């Protein structure tokens, strides 16, 4: 039994690929109960904030449903794929390194096995806009549910406006 479990854990690590370079864990902004559950945790909507670790001056807020009940309280529930996303410029934009279109900005597990939420980023070079996409996927199949947010790169104080197209690999 231990061998099977160890194999599954190893396979999950290989399938998920290398972890993105994350500067920090997301900050919980607030939670709001949506379904009351007697004697067990309620179902909730949780709103988090995260700064883009590779592009200074951009922050994203996302809201995810969190299941309550016994399985949710034990961390065993598979969460649904309904995730909303809003990203904004919060300071002068500074690119730390070159990026590829669709690079993972943030990844989080959404179930005990094989389901994860990902925020990926790209650049619309023609419009000089950063584009962020959140979606969830599983080992075998993903969900078509997604949310997109655009961040036009605007002047901030006296700083020069960088062109995101110059930072694509």
Regions found by a protein language model. Give the residues of each.
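Bacterial N-terminal signal peptides that target proteins for export
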Residues: 1-8
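Short alpha-helical segments and helix-capping/turn motifs at coil-helix boundaries
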Residues: 10, 43-46, 116-117
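Composition- and surface-driven signal marking solvent-exposed, interaction-prone regions
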Residues: 1, 20, 74-75
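C-terminal segment of classical bacterial N-terminal signal peptides
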Residues: 12-21
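Mature extracytoplasmic domains of secretory-pathway proteins
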Residues: 57-125
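N-terminal secretory signal peptides
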Residues: 24-84
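Generic structural motif
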Residues: 50-52, 65, 90-92, 137, ...
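Low-complexity intrinsically disordered segments
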Residues: 26, 94-169
């Amino acid at each position: 039994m231990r061998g099977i479990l160890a194999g599954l854990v190893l396979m999950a690590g290989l399938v998920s690929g290398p972890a993105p370079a994350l500067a920090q864990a997301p900050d919980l902004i607030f939670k709001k109960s949506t379904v009351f559950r007697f004697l067990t945790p309620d179902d909730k909507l949780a709103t988090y904030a995260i700064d883009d670790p590779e592009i200074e001056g951009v922050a994203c807020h996302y809201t995810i449903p969190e299941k309550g009940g016994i399985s949710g309280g034990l961390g065993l529930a598979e969460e649904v794929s309904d995730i909303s996303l809003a990203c904004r410029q919060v300071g002068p934009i500074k690119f730390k390194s070159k990026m590829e279109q669709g690079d993972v900005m943030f990844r989080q597990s959404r179930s005990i096995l094989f389901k994860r939420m990902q925020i990926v980023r790209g650049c619309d070079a023609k419009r000089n806009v950063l584009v962020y996409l959140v979606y969830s996927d599983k080992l075998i199949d993903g969900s078509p549910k997604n949310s997109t947010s655009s961040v036009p790169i605007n002047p901030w104080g006296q700083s020069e406006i960088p062109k995101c197209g110059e930072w694509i690999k």
